[in-house]
Amino acid sequence: MKSLAKLTKGVIIVAMKTLIGSAPVLAGTFVYVSNADDGDIGVYSVQTDGSLKPGEHAKAANVVMPMAVSPDRRFLYAAARSKPYSVFVYAIDPNTGALKALSVSPLAESFPYISLDKTGRYLFGASYGSNMISVNAIGEDGRVAHEPLQMIPVGRNAHSIRTDESNKFVFVCTLGSDQIFQFTFDSKTGHLASNTPAVFLTKPALGPRHFITSSDNKFVYVLSELTGTVTTFSLNSDTGLLTEVSSASGLPPESKLVPGAPRGPVGTPGGPPPRNTDNDIWAADLHLTPNGKFLYMTERTNNSLASFSVDGASGKLIFLGSTPTENQPRGFAIDPKGRFLVVSGEKSDTISAYAIDETSGAVKLIGKYPAGKGANWVEIVSFD
């Protein structure tokens, strides 16, 4: 009996040493990357040091691009921009991060951007090629209704649609017409109605593309695809209307890039650009750290990740610098605790993970990890 007890104790000690010595996974934190050319979604688990461990891929469809996660983190939504236009719904395993295919529903058009309202009951889509937005209901089981509740024409080249933090207002950036559409939103019915005024007209040739709202709902930050600037707007929480505050460039002073022009939609022939675009500014995505202290944006022509500090009182941005990153970095995401940032490149065979310095906002490369073809949209989900 004493020998058995001794043996059991030894096994336990060895097992504990093995567990302690292994590279631990950051409890329930996972990265998802849509691979447009492969037609699938890459799954990665985040280790405690911010490194990534590649996992299984989930099948989707050709030109799968924008994604969104439900507020309760139960479901991942991914839209395919190839015909038939569809949204794929997956259940997220909180223990492994694995995606289980639940359903496929038709979408009205090719959407470069999808998002959910704060209740998770409605899916919004913005169509670049058809100049419209749509709203679809979502069931308790996460499935998207086959028929949209609304289809609303907006300005040319709609590129993003999101609610504010209160879930009472919705904004739409239309890149080709230099407009930001302002809506009121009824979360009980999913109905959008034009605010008054219905449109904020930006500066000419700005090309508003993506936007993000501060967590305190005081400011909206809008990325210009064509100028590489981020414009700060104050948000009136009572009326849902925007007022321009300031603007900051995400390009270093020595940059030789020139203002860009709207391009043809993905997945369709589109019209040829008005000139050679090799030296055009082509900004892509922006995100805030959860504490609101830093903002980042990507630019696809010079393959860079720009950093800004944020003045919480005024919303004004100060350009901190630019970091080389993946080739044609269309998408990136920041983990929910603001410790790590992951960037994908449409013309890269890797994705990059960075550590974020919580004091300075500086990013430091942790590592590069295998990616699928045409990697573009990135989502990070944490269950810790």
For each feature predicted by the language model, list its residue ranges:
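A short beta-strand motif characteristic of beta-propeller blades
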Residues: 53-59, 100-105, 147-152, 195-201, ...
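Blade-loop segments of beta-propeller domains
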Residues: 55-120
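Beta-rich, blade/repeat-based domains predominating
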Residues: 61-72, 107-122, 151-169, 201-217, ...
